[in-house]
Amino acid sequence: MQMKNGWTRGQFRIFRVTFGIYLLYHFLSLLPWGPELFSSQGVLSQGTMSPLFHLFPNLFLLWDSPLFVQACLLAAAIFSLLLTFGKFDRVMAVMVWYVWASLYGRNPLIGNPSLPFIGWILLAYALIPSLSARDELSSTSEDTGFWRMPADIFAAAWILMALTYSYSGYCKLISPSWMDGTALHHVLSNPLARDTVVRTSLLALPAWSLKAATWSALFLELAFAPLALIRRLRPLLWVAMVGLHLGLLVLVNFSDLTIGMLILHFFTFDPAWIPSPEPVGQSIFYDGHCGLCHGLVRFILNEDHSAHPFSFAPLQGEEVKRSIAESVRAELPDSVVVVDENKNVLTRSAAVIYVLKRLGGLWFLGATLLSLVPRTLRDLAYDGVASVRKRIFGRTEEVCPLVPRQLRARFLH
């Protein structure tokens, strides 16, 4: 089974950074408790007390002193940081997985439902094509440089998630509190529940409403796997479960579980669920002697896989004279200018927002958030970057970036 998806190189980098920060926080938060949880002087003084200890060559088989445990946690934090910045990221994913699995094998009492998912994602990450292998589009490459999330890995993640949710719901059928609808009330009354206005307000609701919420959550879990077979229902199921986990994050002080599950949902998110409009005839004019502008062009080439992609031309070329009236050109900035499908000329932050919305997926969400910022502030930030771009990113002699032969038709002359 394969599932096509809309992940692109740039969007998956956002996942990588988010994932890496989560792992870094996880290991750093464990540092003060490491000796108590995993060492020979902790709650399980002997590793053999764990039924999982000998399932594979555990890191702590030969040595589990408090100092060694903390050194391993610190090393895992460093590996996570390197993964965050994309340095040997696939190797770092395997290294983090090994520490992750060893810690769980040494003390399974730390377990929560998200830990196996995170371990699986680490291994899956190691099998995903490198995000940097063709990061710079080469003029001699026959490949367009387009990166894609492998469809079989994406499908495997969805199958694993769907079956686990439905199995979790099935197991809840033998729980009296889930069957009589009082499970949510018990969660809100639990010592781990956050003492907030939201919790107090929910406890004040009629008993039937909490029961309805409990049974709705149970039905969602039970039906997740069969309903996920229907492609059009997957976004709705995904959003419903994310909403459920966000609710738990607000209500219950067990963030390590909830954030881990949200990481799984981020991995199974399909950017194609947020399609971009595909107008015809939009062009981007850029400063041909600006290193940052060349980088922007390469970024858009990597991210724009639409049927009617952007065309490009340098501001120093002849195409800009044919496309934009002289009276308008006199007022244009010398960085990036967009001419949309209606021949409107967009500059500064308006041009950035248009391009991001046009790329769809996570970029569309980012553009939507950016559009909430007053334009005066957006343009001020844009002008600040534009004023120092050549000092920081350098100048280029060639007005067109180096790109594969197949992409050269995207450049207007």
Would you name each region that the model predicts?
Residues N302-S306, F411-H413:
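Short cysteine/histidine-rich zinc-coordinating motifs and their immediately flanking basic loops
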Residues M1-Y286, G291-E303, F310-E318:
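Alpha-helical membrane-anchoring segments
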Residues G317-H413:
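Thiol/selenol-based redox catalytic cores and closely related redox-interacting motifs
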